[in-house]
Amino acid sequence: MVSQALRLLCLLLGLQGCLAAGGVAEASGGETRDXXWKPGPHRVFITQEEAHGVLHRRRRANAFLEELRPGSLERECKEEQCSFEEAREIFKDLERTKLFWISYSDGDQCASSPCQNGGSCKDQLQSYICFCLPAFEGRNCETYKDDQLICVNENGGCEQYCSDHTGTKRSCRCHEGYSLLADGVSCTPTVEYPCGKIPILEKRNASKPQGRIVGGKVCPKGECPWQVLLLVNGAQLCGGTLINTIWVVSAAHCFDKIKNWRNLIAVLGEHDLSEHDGDEQSRRVAQVIIPSTYIPGTTNHDIALLRLHQPVVLTDHVVPLCLPERAFSERTLAFVRFSLVSGWGQLLDRGATALELMVLNVPRLMTQDCLQQSRKVGDSPNITEYMFCAGYSDGSKDSCKGDSGGPHATHYRGTWYLTGIVSWGQGCASVGHFGVYTRVSQYIEWLQKLMRSEPRPGVLLRAPFP
């Protein structure tokens, strides 16, 4: 009897002639003996080619017994459907398999190129992630970041002036004498002596004055090039600030008692009052304009605009300070902590005046803080919206008599701007008191209108304000 194992094999293979009479010796005891088997004229096993034609199953690859060959992504998963385990056998790495399986199982979510503006796409299971270039944001990198910039936030990223626009992104602009660079935010000088730059430092490749008035230090020659010295009858009167070749800003109270206006002289490029070094330029003051709201002997609206008889020549030692736009001054410059004040005023309260130009770095205070500090020493100064406080409450440093009318200059991103005018204070460097400055931003439009208008007759003029 043919063994059960052989019969089963024959049935599974469906072979014809598998059990031919002469093919297998049959043992009398019901069991086969290898030693008694003798080959007959018929075969039990067929050739590989015949078997390949007999075995019928769902085709998964290009050849028989493909599992014995190295895995191929093209053969296993592109021509036929493969399982996760089969893909893992091909990649030999779980993470690589997962990355492949995301796209293989639900399609490539990046196929439609959803990421805009140069963003790169990473496929996820039924989703995708866009990696945006630095200037863009959003799910599909569809939003230009600058669209979210507003001028009140870091000046909109602008180096100088910023303008907000409804429905569109903010735009940057530059002061006269500068032009906007291709990046849309930076400004570059277009003239030899633009306002707010210090040529002496530019040529030395430095950025800020070395000098740090009462408690101050000497401003190195050429590092305060907009400083003006006002003389009347040859005597020191006040300070001032050059804002272009023909206009100077000072304090109105400096002119309360002037009688001989023809002897009012403005000196530019001055440094040491005890010597003449050839960099000075003297110009007669042709006209003094004060606000109609200023009352002599008081402190409110303490500002004056002076027109020179002839323009000055801009040099390394004579450069105007930028008169900023009002919005820029109020929302940006007003929050710069420290600014410079300069002048030839008294070095001590009731002391001698300075021979060399002095400069002091002073912190700006909120009006409420200024009032609170003053009340602690029993004082209640009248600080209006046309003024601001700056200085130190410990009595160590301050502007003083003789500095009046001089500049409070604020530095922002490489350029200096006029933000205040030395006006008044309780003594000089008195404990618990601060210097009070005219808030120039309140008068920007007033100043610009006067400078654009035709000259009017007269030396002292009162112009309507506001």
From Swiss-Prot:
One of its GO terms (molecular function) is calcium ion binding. Residues 106-142, 147-188 form the EGF-like domain. It is found in: Secreted. Disulfide bonds join C77-C82, C110-C121, C115-C130, C132-C141, C151-C162, C158-C172, C174-C187, C195-C322, C219-C224, C238-C254, C370-C389, C400-C428. Pfam families: EGF, FXa_inhibition, Gla, Trypsin. Residues 213-452 form the Peptidase S1 domain. Substrate binds at D398. The record marks S113 as: Important for S-112 for O-xylosylation. The modification 4-carboxyglutamate is found at E66, E67, E74, E76, E79, E80, E85, E86, E89, E95. Residues 1-20 form the signal peptide. GO terms for biological process: blood coagulation; positive regulation of leukocyte chemotaxis; proteolysis. SMART domains: EGF (SM00181), EGF_CA (SM00179), GLA (SM00069), Tryp_SPc (SM00020). InterPro entries: Coagulation_fac-like_Gla_dom, EGF-like_Ca-bd_dom, EGF-like_dom, EGF-type_Asp/Asn_hydroxyl_site, EGF_Ca-bd_CS, GLA-like_dom_SF, GLA_domain, Pept_S1A_FX. SUPFAM superfamilies: GLA-domain, Trypsin-like serine proteases. The record marks R212, I213 as: Cleavage. Belongs to the peptidase S1 family. Initiates the extrinsic pathway of blood coagulation. Serine protease that circulates in the blood in a zymogen form. Factor VII is converted to factor VIIa by factor Xa, factor XIIa, factor IXa, or thrombin by minor proteolysis. In the presence of tissue factor and calcium ions, factor VIIa then converts factor X to factor Xa by limited proteolysis. Factor VIIa also converts factor IX to factor IXa in the presence of tissue factor and calcium. This is Coagulation factor VII.
